[in-house]
Amino acid sequence: MSKMEQLAQKLQQSAHAEQARAAAIEKQYQDWIQSLHVLFDTLELWLQPLVQAQVATLRRDTVTITENPSSGELKTYAAPALTLNVNGKAAAIKPLARFCFGCQGRVDILARENQWHLTRHLEPKEVWYLHTHDRDQGRELDADVLASVFAAY
C-alpha cells in the first residue's frame, strides 16, 4: 500500500469517526428534547390541581437554546418551556442546556425572586432532582417536591 493509499484510508477512518461522533451528539439532543417533553407533560399533570382550583394557569411555550457541547460546534435547537401564573404571580420553567457540569441536562424554575434547578441524571435510569441552589444535593422530583416550590405563593 502506497503512502497516498495509507493517507486516504486514514482520512476515511477519521471522517467516519467524526460522522459517528456527530450522530451520537445529535442522538443525545433528540433524547434530551424527548425527555423535556416527558418532564413537562408530568409537570403539567402534577400542576392540574392548581389549575382545577383556578389558582393557576399554564402555557406551554418553545424556547430557542444555543449551547456548545464538547465538540466545539454551536448547536441551536427548540425546546419546550412552561409559563405559569400561580395565584397572580408569574413563574417560568425553562431548560438551560443539555450539556452541563455534573448532570445530563438542566432546567431552571424561575418563580418570584427565587430560582431552583432541575438536574437530569441518567445512571442507572433517568431521574430529575430539584436543587434550591447549586451546592445542595437535591431532592428527587415528585409532585410533593414540586409543590414545595410554589408553597409560598
Q: Where are the regions that the model predicts?
A:
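Short secondary-structure transition/capping segments
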Residues: 2-5, 96-108, 137-148
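Hydrophobic-cavity lipid-handling domains and compact docking modules
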Residues: 61-119
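A short, compositionally biased N-terminal segment around positions ~18-40 that is enriched
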Residues: 20-36
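Glycine-rich, aromatic-bearing surface loops/beta-hairpins
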Residues: 110-153
